[in-house]
Amino acid sequence: LHDSTNISRIQHYTMNLYKELEAETGQGCGIFQPGSLYLAQTEKRSNQLQLQAAKAKLYGMNFSEINREHAEELHPLVDFTGIHTIMWEPEGGNVDPSGVTAAYAAGARQRGAEIYRFTKVTATIQQSNGSWLIETPKGNINSQWVVNASGLWAREVAKLAKLDLPLLPTEHQYFVTETIPEIAAQGRRLPSVADRDGEYYLRQEGNGLLVGAYERDVRFWAEDETPAEFGHELFKDDLERIEENVLRAIDRVPVLSEAGIKRVINGPMIWSPDSNVLFGPVPELKNYFCCNGIIPGFSQSGGMGLLAAEWIIEGEPKYDMFAWDLTRFGHWANKQFTKSRVGDQYANRFSIHFPYQERAAGRPVRLRPVYQTQIKMGAVMGLNYGWEHPLWFSDKPNTVETNGFTRQNWFKPVA
């Protein structure tokens, strides 16, 4: 599930699509659905999970609170001491990325799509009738639309159309352990565990565990441009950066302390300033569509593809995509702002995102002449298309807005 209702719908659709893909193409997607456990160590995290459970019930999704005894039956290797709330998602799981990619390709070819691998795009030129000429070393392609879904190379492809996208890659690492006897002895696949207060995630991989974290020490990569020759090689291992996260994971799953590390994966992922996808048609260009910066890619890819098709063919998607529309950022979202916000988003990936919360990173960007006057009057500022603007006025200057799922310090002044 996701804090956003529409993203939850997209993810739900995507997981169901993978089953349809397998049946239709005969290509396995490597679907594992042993369920997922979500843990809350604090009252506010409990509130967040309870809010998600209420949304799940409204939209017919299976996500509910369970007691400790039930959780221990589901995952006997987890120590649930100190956990306030445990949520259970029976359909939670993961897929095999290579299998899903192959299934998408097979399904597309069955419907007449042509796929050109290892073919660099050297130019995208808009024609007088609104169509596009795409130049490659292997020949030119004429297309009514261009869809930029270029992953790590989204910025470079966008620049071919004189478009700047506020995106920046970071390093991200996780590791897979050797076989853990206690897991092998279970005779079944164990649920994944999301302990966001502990700032790590883990799931079964073979008869071991896959453990990952979003550390506070963010490491940026390819800040100016992604090298054309980059072939998804891995970076040097640097597990010391996630040592604290791993120690918390060991406290929660003690068998992890005796496990050897089988392999470490340290690779890039590309982020937008608010970690949401840059999605939708580009206003300045006719028939040019972007779908870039999808951090949880394989849990959202199918839904994003559906909405992109709807938007292109029918003129609008079925869901409100305002929060993901790429036009939420303009030229004011420069490199400095993007780097500051991406660093903040990465480091706080597992922090609670409260309703109406405003992030301070990268601000201020644009100030109106009345800014200082408003501050002296007690204005609590928010960000709106790069501009600092008053959200509400306190009875004293420099008031810091509180965040939570109950009434906060803005309630009385606004009411």
Where on the chain are the PLM-derived regions?
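Helical element adjacent to the flavin cofactor pocket in flavoenzyme catalytic cores
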Residues: 87-145, 149, 153-156, 302
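Helix-loop-beta segment of a Rossmann-like dinucleotide-binding subdomain
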Residues: 28-38, 52, 72-111, 133, ...
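A short, glycine/Asx- and small/polar-enriched loop/turn
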Residues: 44, 75-83, 125-133, 271-275, ...
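Basic, glycine/lysine-rich polyanion-binding surfaces/domains
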Residues: 126-128, 322-415
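Short Gly/Ser/Thr- and Asp/Glu-enriched loop/turn motifs at secondary-structure junctions
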Residues: 32-36, 170-171, 264
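Flavin-dependent oxidoreductases
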Residues: 1, 5, 123-235, 244-252, ...
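Dinucleotide-binding Rossmann-like beta1-alpha1 core, especially the glycine-rich loop
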Residues: 1-74, 197-202, 206-210, 343-357, ...
